[in-house]
Amino acid sequence: MSTTRAIPVSLKDRSDIDFSTSLGGTLYGTTPGGTKIVYDRNALLQYRNSPLSKTPPPQLAHITNTELNKKVEKSTTTPTTTTPPTTTAKPKPTNDDDIFPME
């Protein structure tokens, strides 16, 4: 069973930044599914100082190499001329009788 407790947070010094806060000043976030996650001050400070927050993502080197390869491929290819797509104009009805037939 989950428990709820209020932890007041003073945001007077950072009033220019719009955090998701409740009326009592508690910081929270929501997931795409609509679950509300409430963060207390101690947990946020622990997350900021955790070793995981100070390490880069493991796939960062792969992403960087992939982006570099794309840039190299773009610079070595010859530019091709493209023609704009042609569209056929639809004939406009001559009057409203064609659009709304009355019986």
UniProtKB/Swiss-Prot annotation:
Region entry Disordered, spans: 49-103
Keyword set, alphabetical order: Protein synthesis inhibitor, Translation regulation
GO cellular component annotations of the record: cytoplasm
InterPro entries, per the entry: EIF4EBP (IPR008606)
Gene Ontology molecular-function annotations: eukaryotic initiation factor 4E binding
Record-level GO BP terms: negative regulation of translational initiation
Pfam families (alphabetical): eIF_4EBP
Transmembrane regions: none
Zinc found in the keyword field: no
Biased composition (Low complexity): 76-92
Family statement drawn from the similarity comment of this UniProt entry: Belongs to the eIF4E-binding protein family.
Function: Regulates assembly of the eIF4F complex.
Protein known as: Eukaryotic translation initiation factor 4E-1A-binding protein homolog
Organism encoding this protein: Dictyostelium discoideum (Social amoeba)
